Structure formats: C-alpha cells, structure tokens
A protein has these predicted regions:
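The feature captures the beta-strand-to-loop junction immediately N-terminal to the Walker
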Residues: 37-39
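Conserved ABC transporter NBD signature motif
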Residues: 60-68, 77
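Conserved ABC ATPase "signature" region
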Residues: 113-131
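Conserved ABC ATPase signature
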Residues: 135-139
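Catalytic Walker B motif of ABC-type/P-loop ATPase nucleotide-binding domains
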Residues: 160-163
Length: 276
C-alpha cells in the first residue's frame, strides 16, 4: 500500500526554544484511519500541523502524498490536507452555512457550478444540507464542528486531519461522525484523528500513534496499542473501560485485548452458550 504521510527524523522547537517534537519517524498508509493519542503536551497537534505546513520542521522532513510539506504554503497544501481545528470558532467566518462551505472551493479556483456541487455534497455528508441559509452561530456547538468538517471536505483533500472531532457531540452526532469516517475510508481518504477519548478511538480507528513528551513511543493496530496498559501509562493514557474489564476477567477466560463493548457482548454471549 502507498504512503499518504511520511515523517522522517522530525524535530520541532517553538520560537520560545521549547522542544515540542523529538526525532519523530512515522509512516501512515493511504486509506487508513489513524488516531494520535497521548496526554496534553505530548506533541500530537504540533505533529499534525506539519502535515499541512502550518508549522515548518526545525529539522527533518514531512512528505504528504510525496510532496515535501515544508516547501509548500498552507494554502497550497489545502488541496492535499484538510485540517479541522478543535474549536470551530477558530475556523468559521461566513454569514451562512453555504457561504462558509463554498469559500474553500471558490478559493481554489473552482467555478460557481463546481463550487456549489462540492459544497452541497460536503453538507450532505455531514447532515447539514437543510441548513444552507442558517447563520453558523445559530447552530449548536456539535453542528458547528460538523460545519467545519464540511468546509474541509468541500475542497476534496486526500488527507483529512480532525482535532478532537467527537468533543461536544451528542449520541446522534457521534453516530454520524462514525458514519462519516467509514465513508471517507470507503472513498480512499486518509484520516488522522487527534483524540483523548479511547472509547471513540477503539470504535473508529484502525491504527494508533502513541506520543509522549514530543516522542513517538508506539505505533500499531488499535487493538495492539489500546490493550497494553503499561505502554499507555507512559503517556498517562488509560485503556477503554471495557478493556480494563476484560483484563480483569482474563483469568476467567475473557480475552484481555477486547476494546469495544460490542466485542465484550459477543464474547459473553458465546461463553454463555457454550456453558449451557
């Protein structure tokens, strides 16, 4: 499988002199849904901001679909990497939902017909097509986050980065977000999710990158990383609750690497059937 993102010996120091990333090496395959996890200050967002050239390496190299991100402007990288910020207020400025979502395609030089088509498709994906004339700040926090995502999807990037996309979402919003991630994977997009919610990561992501103090300390399948509490503890991260339960019940034959409630339910049902 081809690489969507390649990070080689990446080190970054902020102008203050604080070192935020330390010799990070990482390959992300095309079409994967990958979570960046770790406690606050671990370097997750700093790393992700190198993907679209919001930050330039102090040393090392980041390539996205073969493009050296440090040699392109953020506006040039917008065709390749869409970045959805954690706080929608940092991203929204249009007076209507349609104006907000149409800005990106229009800025990329698309004509009026193509711009409208891209905007409507993106709004349909996130469930906001009925709100095209609504002012963004008349919407709920969760809807505004979905609007930011639509604004990014309208530019049809190859890679989508989402910073805490599940924060502020109700049950319906979380279900919709899961459906969107599945759809992005189905059409070949690479998605990078920054999250502190391990239950969400377990359900929606297939690979996990664990960071601590600017270093990458583990990269592997979601099951492999989330079912290893000692490794997660290095960055003050706890496994999903159901995984902690599975580990506690492992002496009774429950697999310790269960990471979702659905897996636990299936395991217990099968165990009950066998004991009858």
């Amino acid at each position: 499988m081809s690489l969507a993102i390649s990070v080689e010996n990446l080190t970054y120091r902020y102008p203050s002199g604080r070192q935020a990333l330390r010799n990070v090496n990482l390959d992300i395959e095309s079409g994967n849904t990958v979570a960046l996890i770790g406690k606050n200050g671990a370097g997750k967002t700093t790393l992700a901001k190198h993907f679209n050239s919001l930050l330039k390496p102090t040393s090392g190299r980041v390539t996205v679909t073969g493009i050296d991100a440090s040699k392109r402007s953020t506006s040039q990288m917008a065709r390749v990497v869409g970045y959805v910020f954690q706080n929608p207020e940092d991203q929204l400025f249009g007076s209507t939902v349609m104006e907000e979502v149409a800005f990106g395609p229009k800025n990329l030089g698309m004509n009026q017909e193509e711009t409208r088509s891209k905007a409507e498709r993106a709004l349909s994906i996130v469930g906001l097509l009925p709100y095209v004339l609504e002012h963004p700040y008349n919407m709920t926090y969760g809807q505004r986050k979905m609007l930011c995502l639509a604004s990014v999807l309208a530019m049809d990037p190859t890679v989508v980065v989402m910073d805490e996309p599940n924060a502020g979402q109700d049950y319906h919003g979380l279900r919709l977000l899961g459906s969107i991630l599945e759809q992005l994977k189905r059409i070949g997009k690479t998605t990078v999710v920054i999250s502190h919610d391990m239950e969400f990561v377990a359900r929606e992501c297939e690979k996990v990158v664990l960071m601590h103090d600017g270093k990458l300390i583990a990269h592997g399948s979601t099951r492999q990383i989330l079912s290893d509490p000692s490794r997660l503890a290095l960055s003050s991260v706890r496994p999903p609750q159901v995984t902690r339960l599975a580990i506690g019940l492992s002496s009774r034959g429950v697999p310790p690497d269960i990471i979702t409630v659905e897996e636990m339910a299936h395991t217990l049902i099968e165990s009950t059937r066998k004991s009858v």
